[in-house]
């Protein structure tokens, strides 16, 4: 987001030096510009490369094309726009110590900045709600949230984010009335984001705090339910093991089925942890900035401009973290390796459902259709335990020893 202040002091700039030798001061300034330029360029490259990789992987590999990963694609798009249209201009603003792109682009750039942050937090909020319904109502989930509905939700998220970001800024509802702000608005080389108190508080609440509270509340409920289900699984599997030990010893396939079905449930809980890490990282990166954003308009001189800019850039860096977090998922790791040509042949990945849309055929269609469905966790199915007891085998890979549905979306493990 735009920086507050008068535009004369920038993050980590050596302007405070009063060295007697002008040449030494100028040399230090050049070293600082080069060093910060390299660091900021690496940040931009990491954001763009990582999120292009995520978007391409989900678009190319059918196994990754789940409802949840549609939302992940939306999140990656927000991060990609941040890396292409926001961070580079923010870096230029800092390195050049002035704004050289004109007043129109200043407001447009600020609007895109707010848009990306708002779209990201709202998408994370939607993902939390998605996981809540998936874990609490796995049988109703697929009819409740189809891929077409997911596309509509994503479109609505971006429309709402666009309205809350572009409308107030382009209509100048954000503008402060004190003289320093008025001078900046009239100056083509000034792009400090002076805002009135009402806008700063309202935009922070609508764009960040409300979605954050919803996300934290819903995801805490998801983890409570996941913990309850894990405890239930542990207890029921213990009873089943004691009651059917001799039978399992007689039929090795049963033991294999039990182990495999248990892995489905554990994988889904690992997926929840990964999503929790994504949400937690986003919160840790952006919460300090939004706290300072409100404090700054209430007490102007309390927060140094350098601190404000530093916290803003910590938020920017978050856009490069998510692709690294996705590497926790074996599915994403395999997809990334395929895209980066780090695997010998995609044919070896058919067993994991990894065939690109262009190469998908009869060989892998059945497995892909089975695996890409987005049922979650475990729900009791009456009568299946009796079936297992009489037949000696688990009726399906997606049904565990106690008859619980353990289909999993393991693309985010």
UniProtKB/Swiss-Prot annotation:
Keywords: Cell membrane, Disulfide bond, Endosome, G-protein coupled receptor, Glycoprotein, Golgi apparatus, Hydroxylation, Lipoprotein, Membrane, Palmitate, Phosphoprotein, Receptor, Transducer, Transmembrane, Transmembrane helix, Ubl conjugation. Residues 1-34, 96-106, 175-196, 299-305 are extracellular. Glycans are attached at residues 6, 15. GO terms for molecular function: adenylate cyclase binding; amyloid-beta binding; beta2-adrenergic receptor activity; identical protein binding; norepinephrine binding; potassium channel regulator activity; protein homodimerization activity; protein-containing complex binding. Gene3D superfamilies: Rhodopsin 7-helix transmembrane proteins. Coiled coil: none annotated. The chain crosses the membrane at residues 35-58, 72-95, 107-129, 151-174, 197-220, 275-298, 306-329. It is a multi-pass membrane protein. The modification 4-hydroxyproline is found at residues 382, 395. The modification Phosphoserine is found at residues 246, 261-262, 345-346, 355-356. The modification Phosphotyrosine is found at residue 141. Palmitoylated. Mainly palmitoylated at Cys-341. Palmitoylation may reduce accessibility of phosphorylation sites by anchoring the receptor to the plasma membrane. Agonist stimulation promotes depalmitoylation and further allows Ser-345 and Ser-346 phosphorylation. Also undergoes transient, ligand-induced palmitoylation at Cys-265 probably by ZDHHC9, ZDHHC14 and ZDHHC18 within the Golgi. Palmitoylation at Cys-265 requires phosphorylation by PKA and receptor internalization and stabilizes the receptor. Could be depalmitoylated by LYPLA1 at the plasma membrane. Phosphorylated by PKA and BARK upon agonist stimulation, which mediates homologous desensitization of the receptor. PKA-mediated phosphorylation seems to facilitate phosphorylation by BARK. (S)-timolol binds at residues 113, 118, 293, 312, 316. (S)-carazolol binds at residues 113, 203, 312. GO terms for cellular component: apical plasma membrane; ciliary basal body; cilium; clathrin-coated endocytic vesicle membrane; early endosome; endosome; endosome membrane; Golgi apparatus. It is found in: Cell membrane; Early endosome; Golgi apparatus. Belongs to the G-protein coupled receptor 1 family. Adrenergic receptor subfamily. ADRB2 sub-subfamily. Binds NHERF1 and GPRASP1. Interacts with ARRB1 and ARRB2. Interacts with SRC. Interacts with USP20 and USP33. Interacts with VHL; the interaction, which is increased on hydroxylation of ADRB2, ubiquitinates ADRB2 leading to its degradation. Interacts with EGLN3; the interaction hydroxylates ADRB2 facilitating VHL-E3 ligase-mediated ubiquitination. Interacts (via PDZ-binding motif) with SNX27 (via PDZ domain); the interaction is required when endocytosed to prevent degradation in lysosomes and promote recycling to the plasma membrane. Interacts with CNIH4. Interacts with ARRDC3. Beta-adrenergic receptors mediate the catecholamine-induced activation of adenylate cyclase through the action of G proteins. The beta-2-adrenergic receptor binds epinephrine with an approximately 30-fold greater affinity than it does norepinephrine. This is Beta-2 adrenergic receptor. It comes from Homo sapiens. The gene is ADRB2.
